[in-house]
Curated annotation (Swiss-Prot):
Gene3D superfamilies: Zn peptidases. Glycans are attached at N671, N751, N825, N854. Binds 2 Zn(2+) ions per subunit. Residues 36-352, 412-420, 473-487, 669-681, 730-1011 are vacuolar. It comes from Eremothecium gossypii (strain ATCC 10895 / CBS 109.51 / FGSC 9923 / NRRL Y-1056) (Yeast). The record marks Y292 as: Transition state stabilizer. CDD domains: M28_Fxna_like (cd03875). Zn(2+) 2 binds at D161, E194, H293. May be involved in vacuolar sorting and osmoregulation. Residues 542-567 have a biased composition (Basic residues). This is Vacuolar membrane protease. It comes from the Eukaryota. Keywords: Glycoprotein, Hydrolase, Membrane, Metal-binding, Metalloprotease, Protease, Transmembrane, Transmembrane helix, Vacuole, Zinc.
Length: 1011
């Protein structure tokens, strides 16, 4: 019992040891959760074969980059179609559908997310989705869609984005053609997701889409690792995930909030499905981002373990939905997260709001009641300013030091976060803790408070209370889409409980403890009863001792002699009134928790763990009733003496764990956005600073009691990680700097062949270009005004077509523009009548072109409103016979067909861009019709606007893209790729540089025309 008391006494050694154990446990759980999937390959033969087949499929479809604008895209389509036919061949309840063969096409509008205006991009898309349907036994159940896209970006091989999703679907399809589900399953292997989410949009033109209510979308925005639940539709779907995915669930609603708030700049097909009313789950790989969309997105840089994590997660979820009819009534936004990769927690965002309101009222009320009780008992006798100011002063000074370090890193090595975000966070957190340790422990030595930790916990709780109010309001104002704010609720809850425990124990311990007159309110009767109990205990001890060793009078005399000479050695010694008054005058008073000897001699590292003193005698016998009452009081007081350990275990482990896990998830997904924009840099550095402070927060109330050895450990950690943060190279071969590439042939500038490199700073690109053999001159300027620079130089011309390599003038044979019709200057058109024109784009071996529009009062999305109101995709009919009409077919969301089968899209808020995607490489043209309003009609909106015939002109910039670069070509007798400028960059760039495509293709050809 004595050993137990000594071990749990509030001592520097005990606290520091418990802290080290806590950090070790958290680290172990984190590492185990992060890397456990490496050791969970399937042992079951069927699952192992499923994984082996999926891996083989992945190796085949990722042999070449296969964007929509490439011939390799057709090869992947054909392979998937053959595999689906092979899988479903012998099934009586499975069927397939090929959009390519059906000739399915669509014309739809996308909002202009960049400008935030009502102006929009219109997309014409010829689909080559491959679909399979497994008919369920129960037709009353709504269908489930599984979706993944098989196209890649031009610079990537598409292993993670999104080959793993595709082969996971093939494996699941193989399973269900042998095991008929209750619910109908539809598999959509869709195309052209990378540049417009077109394949998902085209799905809703297919008749099978009418059967679907739920969707599982598989995506990849990283390069392996674990597949996370990016987002889910509502509480019901989140609960389905929790019940279905029992092995290694992984998800967090912070990512969901990132999509809702626009912090995640890219979108997945899930957005299209959700906009069409489907409910479901968006599952994706999310890190590392710097290998995403690059030549390292191959099977060499991922693993079977990562593939199995996605496949198994999707399989568990599909299995659950295929045979169950879950309750899907709750459609409110969900808050969710996993615990240790073992359990999955789901709340309603609205319930979180109500819970926040409750605890914001409850916890302060409990603390107020306890303080009122203490005040009524006259226990609040302490120097208020001395007690309340020391933590704020310490935090401010420590924050100043950490902020200086952050500024220093920003000047010397700002991009280190892209490679390693853990070291800067640990440096800032350990520096913050060490500075608070020095300040608070020194202050405690100069002006000791008996229980500063409780005072500090109350203060931290007050600060979190204020912040939680703003968080709760944010949650309400966001219409409950701010689903990533739950960590603040958890942090405030645990810290407030710790503060309540401290104040509660201190209040009632002061009432029960009669040993210290500094606790006003204890009666003399209680003191006498305590003395009588101690006398009774002593007499029993003395009687036993005298029977075994010596005559009673000798033992009694010896005991008296011992007490007379060594009164401070008694474990139950009651100090004299004079001594108590002296202690009370020297120590500031607060309702604090102390051990049973506190107030007279504070424990230190030289205090014995086990007190070996004797027990003092008392002359009077004690009644049995008083003895039992005092004994119980003694037990309760002893329990209350260890409140510090309860406070520590409630606050520090849980708040630290949740803070670190959430911080790691955010930084792991966003740290490499520091390469993409100044906004990304600001977000990452500020998040690291805020995260390090929050990580230190649960330790602050206990820092003053740390052992000096623990303080030195924090100092050592701070110095080591700080030095590494400053001197570490920000980019390495395994964590490279990503630059974006585009080569453009401008037919309006003498067929100039310009290479454009986009990167975070020109200081990274200029040394690279200095070492490229063919580059003699380049120019670098700021691009887009967000910290991104662009470098331009004349590069080796691309070799896309074997019959057009001889001279630069031959590029005019690859793309030309014909104006088939233009009535802007026609006398038959009235000044108020819309202007119409028809344009033919002749382009060789092409699938993708984009048209951007401008006028004297409008330039893309930068200013004004686009005058273009309608676009027409003209098919095989003669252009002179086409008469646009609103009444030939019903208009649906701006789209309709005329009697000639031409596709129309009308949007009266202005069309900014038209994207054209066709499948047939051999059909060497696009024919489009345009309708825009004259500037004269704008006078009603702006009287100062003048109009002329030139003002009504519509500028059209046509850009066509080619997506393949890895195809062999012969140039001057040497083997090369189709884009030798890109090949040269890859060959002569440092190992810590990697390239990604900027646009829909590696090469673009542009031409401007005015209508």
């Amino acid at each position: 019992m004595k050993l137990t008391k000594a071990v749990f006494r509030f001592r520097r050694t005990n606290l520091s040891t418990l802290l080290v154990i806590t950090y070790l446990v958290i680290t172990t759980l984190y590492v185990w959760d992060h890397f456990r999937y490496h050791f969970t390959l399937p042992s079951d033969y069927n699952y192992a074969q499923m994984l082996a087949d999926a891996w083989l499929d992945l190796e085949i479809i990722t042999q070449y980059p296969h964007p929509y604008a490439s011939h390799a895209n057709d090869k992947v389509h054909d392979y998937l179609l053959d595999r689906v036919k092979e899988i479903t061949r012998d099934s009586m309840f499975a069927e397939i559908s090929d959009d390519y063969g059906m000739g399915l096409r669509t014309l739809f509008r996308q909002e202009d997310a960049i400008s935030g205006t009502k102006e929009s991009t219109v997309v014409y898309y010829e689909s080559s989705n491959v679909l399979a349907r497994v008919q369920g036994r129960n037709s009353a159940l709504d269908g489930l869609l599984l979706s993944a896209h098989y196209d890649s970006v031009p610079s990537g091989y598409g292993a993670t984005d999104d080959g793993m999703g595709v082969v996971s679907m093939l494996a699941i399809l193989t399973h269900y053609v042998k095991n008929q589900p209750e619910r109908t399953l539809v598999f959509n292997f869709n195309n052209n997701q990378e540049f417009g989410l077109a394949g998902a949009s085209a799905f809703f033109e297919h008749p099978w889409s009418k059967e679907i209510s739920y969707v599982i979308n598989l995506e990849g925005t990283g390069a392996g690792g674990k597949a996370v639940l990016f987002r889910t539709s509502d509480v019901s779907t989140a609960q389905v995930y929790a019940e279905a995915v029992r092995q290694q669930p992984f998800g967090n609603s912070m990512y969901q909030q990132g999509f809702y708030n626009g912090h995640i700049g890219t979108e997945t097909d899930f957005q299209v499905y959700e906009d069409q009313g489907l409910r479901g789950w968006d599952i994706a790989f999310y890190r590392p981002r710097n290998l995403y969309h690059t030549a390292k997105d191959t099977v060499l840089y991922t693993s079977k373990q990562a593939l199995w994590h996605m496949l198994h997660t999707a399989l568990q979820l599909t299995d659950y939905m295929a045979i169950n009819k879950p309750d899907m009534e709750d459609t409110s936004n969900a808050v969710y997260f996993d615990l240790f990769g073992k359990w999955f927690v789901v709340w309603s965002a609205r319930s979180l709001f109500y819970w926040n309101c409750i605890i914001l009222a409850l916890f302060p009320s409990i603390l107020a009641i306890l303080f009122l009780v203490a005040y009524d008992m006259q226990l609040l006798k302490f120097n208020f300013w001395d007690a309340m100011l020391r933590l704020p002063v310490s935090v401010c000074l420590a924050y100043f030091c950490v902020k200086l370090f952050q500024v220093l890193v920003g000047q010397l090595n700002p991009y280190v976060f892209s490679r390693d975000y853990v070291s800067p966070i640990l440096a800032e957190a350990s520096m913050f803790i060490f500075m608070n340790y020095v300040i608070l422990s020194s202050w405690e030595r100069l002006r000791p408070l008996r229980d500063f930790k409780t005072v500090a916990l109350v203060e931290v709780s007050m600060v979190l209370w204020i912040y939680l109010i703003s968080v709760t309001r944010w949650l309400r104002d966001s219409d409950y889409t701010a689903t990533g704010l739950y960590p603040f609720t958890i942090g405030y809850t645990f810290v407030s409980i710790g503060a309540i425990i401290g104040v509660f124990c201190a209040t009632f311990k002061a009432k029960l403890n009669p040993e210290d007159d500094s606790y006003v309110g204890d009666s003399k009767v209680d003191i006498e009863q305590q003395q009588m109990l101690m006398q009774h205990q002593y007499q029993q001890h003395s009687q036993k001792h005298s029977n075994q060793h010596s005559p009673h009078h000798s033992t009694h005399h010896s005991a008296q002699h011992s007490v007379h000479h060594s009164p401070r050695q008694s474990i139950h010694q009651v100090p004299s009134s004079e001594q108590r008054q002296r202690d009370a005058s020297e120590t500031p008073h607060v309702i604090i928790s102390v051990d049973h000897t506190a107030g007279h001699q504070e424990d230190s590292e030289v205090t014995p763990l086990l007190n070996t003193g004797t027990v003092a005698p008392f002359p009077k016998p004690v009644p049995e009733r008083v003895s039992r009452k005092s004994f119980l009081r003694n037990v309760v007081t002893s329990i209350l003496n260890y409140d510090w350990s309860i406070q520590f275990m409630v606050v520090t482990p849980w708040v630290t764990y949740f803070t670190w896990i959430c911080l790691d998830l955010i930084m792991g997904a966003m740290n490499q956005t520091i390469q993409e924009s100044a906004k990304g840099t600001t977000f990452v550095t500020h998040m690291a600073l805020i995260g390090s402070l929050l990580l230190s927060l649960p330790m602050l109330p206990f820092t003053y009691k740390l052992h000096s050895f623990a303080g030195m450990l924090f100092l050592l950690l701070a110095v080591t990680t700080a030095v590494w943060t400053i001197v570490a190279p920000p980019f390495t071969e395994s964590s490279p700097l990503k630059l974006r590439f585009l080569q453009t042939i401008d037919l309006d500038k003498n067929n100039s062949s310009s290479v454009y490199l986009y990167g975070r700073e020109r200081t990274f690109m200029e040394p690279i270009l200095d070492d490229i053999p063919s580059v003699t001159k380049y120019r670098c300027v700021e691009y887009a005004g967000d910290g991104v620079d662009i470098c331009e130089y004349n590069g080796m011309p691309p070799r896309m077509f074997n019959n057009h390599h001889e001279a630069e003038s031959d590029w005019t044979k690859i793309m030309t523009l014909e104006i088939l019709k233009d009535d802007r200057n026609s006398t038959s058109r009235t000044p108020y009548q819309p202007i119409t024109a028809e344009l033919k784009i002749n382009v060789e071996e092409n699938r993708v072109c984009t048209l951007n529009f401008n006028s004297t009062a409008f330039k893309n999305w930068k200013q004004g409103v686009s005058p273009l109101r309608e676009v027409v995709i003209l098919h095989e009919n003669p252009s002179s016979n086409v008469t646009p009409s609103f009444y030939n077919t019903a208009m649906k969301n701006g789209y309709y067909q005329d009697e000639f089968g031409n596709d129309h899209y009308r949007w009266n808020n202005g069309i900014t861009e038209l994207q054209l995607h066709k499948l047939d490489f051999k059909r060497g043209y696009y024919k489009i019709g345009l309708e825009w309003i004259p500037q004269l009609l704008y006078r009603g909106y702006d009287p100062a606007t003048s109009s002329s015939e030139e003002d009504d002109a519509l500028g059209v910039s046509v850009t066509c893209y080619w997506g393949e670069y890895d195809t062999d070509s012969i140039t001057d007798g040497f083997a090369t790729t189709n884009v030798p400028a890109y090949d040269e960059l890859r060959k002569y760039s440092p190992k810590n540089i990697i390239y990604s495509s900027k646009e829909k293709g590696m090469v673009s050809v542009t031409k401007y025309v005015e209508l």
